[in-house]
Amino acid sequence: YNGVYGAKNVPGNGEYAMAQLNDLGIDLGTSNVLIYQQGKGLVLRRPAVVAIERSTKKVLAIGDDAQRMVGRTPSNIMAIRPLKQGTVADFELTNTMLRFFLNGVLSKRLFSGPRVVMSVPSGVTETEKHSLINILLDAGVKRTYLLDRPLAAALGVGMDLRQRYGRMIVDMGAGITDIAVISEGEIVQSSSVYYAGDYFDDAIVRYIRKKYSLLIGERTAEQIKINIGTAMKPETDEANLAMPVVGRNQLSGLPRTQEIHAAEIYEALKDPVAALIGSIQDVLVRTPPQLASDIFDDGIVLSGGAAGLARLPEAIYTALHIPCGVADDPQTSVVLGCGIAVEDPGAYASLLDDGRKGFKRL
């Protein structure tokens, strides 16, 4: 899935017709914020984390500095992800974080108010859309256009959305997974589910706590998933792959090191992976037969950071008998799709939602 192709060639209407130098594409994710700048490409990739003082709510750090505090802060400091499962959990902190990142990307000379194309989960409500638009307006954005996350991911991995042909994209973020069937630039069937990166991490935390009475943090669980996680039962040699894990003994309260094997992490992830595959199957069952036939021929594309789980395409193929592959750079698929719309907004006007329906400025 290399290369970039156009979507439906819809003439611009003035609002969309010409990109400006400081126009941006934004992937505001649960775990990371990525920004694409017109004419420059990907200019920012930072953790969506804010560290605050617990009593005063004073912001102490944002992005990388805040991420380093996760699980390591004293009791008076909290490291918070202001977005949960793809939606805004803390309006004020999301605003502060976005303004910080925008100021870092745009020079003061250019910051006359950019226009922004932002991705949103396919199941997001009008109220949640309006919250995002208000946050961007408060952060200094001139105008916001929303792009369904599956469409952004499809553009980013190089799908030609002009075709009267069924394609399936499964975009796996930290908080949410968007499953969508796309044809002629429109989402025909979709589902947003929580079987995503954080859900996998939580399953690892629970498994290790139950089996070893060992408490580990979310960052440790993520590293375990990256290093030895697998969606398929490991072969003999692979099953013996192990890594030392440091946690806190639930009984004594003292630090302890435990060796964890790949076979154990497969057991921890077996049910979450099965639930994800079941959700993909549910979308396929609701898909019109001709489009489903196209997908059986052409396969499923995985994007998003959580798509990096080892042997996940193989697990999907084994269960559904449909070819499955991962985008070349799954973490950037969505923001690159937003960037494509930013570079040629007139051609993608039919995909963009200006969010005006029932919108009220807060």
Region locations from a protein language model:
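Nucleotide/phosphate-binding catalytic cleft detector across ATP-hydrolyzing
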Residues: 1-172, 180-300, 307-362
